[in-house]
Amino acid sequence: MSSPLTLQVRDLKVSYNGREVLNRISLPDLHAGELIALAGPNGAGKSTFLKAIAGLVHATGCVRLDGRDCLRWSASERAQHVGFMPQALPEDTRLTVLEATLAALRGNAAGVRRQDEIQALQVIDRLGIGELALRPLFELSGGQRQLAALAQAVVRGSPLVLLDEPVSALDLAHQWQVMNEARRLADEGRIVIVVLHDLTLAAQWANRIAILNERQVHSFGCPAEVISDQLLQEVWCVRARVRFCEQGRPYVLVDGPASQSRVCSTL
């Protein structure tokens, strides 16, 4: 019997033009069936972390999926194993939602099989955007493009799924829909890492949460243990109260800045 899917991240470093963006990021092993939320203030390196794992920026260190070195994968190997959703799709593309999803599935939108179309349409319908399948991406709203980007990220069935702020432009109903899809993917045996700004949403859906701050991992663990008044003051520089709902999940109430000078210095 094969061992469960595992992602290892050790001493991950990324620099842009000589400026360090991630400084020796290490995490406990991540396992199949887990949805990991990645949170932190603006500029903490969350998007860069996902891009490094996806092989979209140069990085050093150790990133291994089932013992295989992700940082050395070819483009085709990466496409096979990693589904990546960026913060936004290009706004000027004339591909339809269906064509873009087929391109993500097969590498191009031409010469696809009927079974490919069925698979792509099933994913599109599951995300609630079936009526948009034949519309060009440039005609869509920001929220609709996010859902189209999610379809492209998950259509291959990759074992590792990376979602960069997938709910930032969505209303409450579509936020639930996206997070429910992310949870479903994890429950099917994938590893799903989601960048979120909403800690309450992270606590509702994630098995564990990683907090990035000042280019490093500040804390990691289950949301109920990690999210605290002290964490919010140290990382986000706010006075806040963490309370727990009847299901034992934390939610956050922000009362104001902990220090106006500190808040301004982080922007």
Mark where each language-model region is.
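Conserved ABC ATPase signature
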Residues: P136-L140, Q144
